[in-house]
Amino acid sequence: MTNIRKTHPLMKIVNNAFIDLPAPSNISSWWNFGSLLGICLILQILTGLFLAMHYTSDTMTAFSSVAHICRDVNYGWIIRYMHANGASMFFICLFIHVGRGLYYGSYTFLETWNIGVILLFTVMATAFVGYVLPWGQMSFWGATVITNLLSAIPYIGTNLVEWIWGGFSVDKATLTRFFAFHFILPFIIAALAMVHLLFLHETGSNNPTGIPSDADKIPFXPYYTIKDILGALLLILFLMLLVLFMPDLLGDPDNYTPANPLNTPPHIKPEWYFLFAYAILRSIPNKLGGVLALIXSILILILMPLLHTSKQRSMIFRPLSQCLFWILVADLLTLTWIGGXXVEHPFIIIGQLASILYFLIILVLMPMISTIENNLLKW
């Protein structure tokens, strides 16, 4: 008799995805982040569900309901901070996951990569609408500033913004619909993640060498299940360190002030994981230009397969490209720093230079260096 896990209609799907899946024998810890993202998503959906049981999406009571969760609900404070810091962990894993894809040439799996980019946009949208819900000062003004960017769209811009707001300013209607979006989007993300996995399992995983590993595959369980559990434990350790010792480290103090449309905070800035894009947006002294640069800074990932000029897939044997990759990482960290600093003398020019460098590296320098490396290897 064959094993039930191989015959049962539901169990065989799980079996083929997580147990008997043929996996390359040499994938490093950088390949752990896919499963960590899955864990983050499950954690966010669960904590979010319990928060939604006590939250009210009304401008009069939203801020108070979050305070009530933290003060009066059993373990409400830990659920709230796990959800808030869980989002930060989600984005850390997401950025590493994308960086891994860039470094090892995983973007040559076109469908998997493109669904990944759609997932990135969806997660960013979810995080943005979620940040509005506590209805603090930064929630309100962040929502006002970011939604207002749509007014840069010619002809239909103003109507579009008022349609999204449900009125002439960010108000009760906006908060209610943002709560609805924030509730539904994680389930869309979960569905997209399954499609992402489906396409990945059509080709099998990439590996650090970028060379096909069909001749040397090992079963996913127990080898990578154990490896993923180790990653998960480290993720939870790091998350709980944040939650229990420094829950407000990554938050904004302004969000502990209830939203007030009559009082603008001196520095409006989003959560840390959007700062790089915010810096690119601010570095262009034109509204429409800034919005286009903001969208293009993420959308540029879709072009990666087209910009790949190297005859090797991975960067592991390409020291010049490696150097450029780490310059890109440093540039993104610089943009993140600039996004959180005030719009004044040294920061403006640094932000503009870092933004130019970002697009220059991806669109010009990387394809150019790859071609040079091909010639150096006399290919």
Swiss-Prot record:
Miscellaneous comment text of the record: Heme 1 (or BL or b562) is low-potential and absorbs at about 562 nm, and heme 2 (or BH or b566) is high-potential and absorbs at about 566 nm.
Natural source organism: Muntiacus vuquangensis (Giant muntjac)
The entry's keywords: Electron transport, Heme, Iron, Membrane, Metal-binding, Mitochondrion, Mitochondrion inner membrane, Respiratory chain, Transmembrane, Transmembrane helix, Transport, Ubiquinone
Membrane topology annotation: Multi-pass membrane protein
Stated family: Belongs to the cytochrome b family.
GO biological process, one term: mitochondrial electron transport, ubiquinol to cytochrome c
Quaternary structure, from the entry: The cytochrome bc1 complex contains 11 subunits: 3 respiratory subunits (MT-CYB, CYC1 and UQCRFS1), 2 core proteins (UQCRC1 and UQCRC2) and 6 low-molecular weight proteins (UQCRH/QCR6, UQCRB/QCR7, UQCRQ/QCR8, UQCR10/QCR9, UQCR11/QCR10 and a cleavage product of UQCRFS1). This cytochrome bc1 complex then forms a dimer.
Subcellular compartments: Mitochondrion inner membrane
Essential cofactor(s): heme b
Name used for this protein in its record: Cytochrome b
Pfam families reported for this sequence: Cytochrom_B_C, Cytochrome_B
InterPro entries to which the protein is assigned, alphabetical: Cyt_b/b6_C (IPR005798), Cyt_b/b6_C_sf (IPR036150), Cyt_b/b6_N (IPR005797), Cytb/b6-like_sf (IPR027387), Cytochrome_b (IPR030689), Cytochrome_b_C_euk/bac (IPR048260), Cytochrome_b_N_euk/bac (IPR048259), Di-haem_cyt_TM (IPR016174)
UniProt-annotated binding residues for heme b b562: 83, 182
Function recorded in the entry: Component of the ubiquinol-cytochrome c reductase complex (complex III or cytochrome b-c1 complex) that is part of the mitochondrial respiratory chain. The b-c1 complex mediates electron transfer from ubiquinol to cytochrome c. Contributes to the generation of a proton gradient across the mitochondrial membrane that is then used for ATP synthesis.
Cofactor note: Binds 2 heme b groups non-covalently.
SUPFAM superfamilies registered for this protein in UniProt: a domain/subunit of cytochrome bc1 complex (Ubiquinol-cytochrome c reductase), Transmembrane di-heme cytochromes
Organism taxonomic ancestry: Eukaryota, Metazoa, Chordata, Craniata, Vertebrata
Cellular component aspect of the GO annotation: mitochondrial inner membrane; respiratory chain complex III
Residues of the signal peptide: none
Positions that bind a ubiquinone: 201
Binding-site list for heme b b566: 97, 196
Transmembrane segments: 33-53, 77-98, 113-133, 178-198, 226-246, 288-308, 320-340, 347-367
GO molecular function, one term: metal ion binding
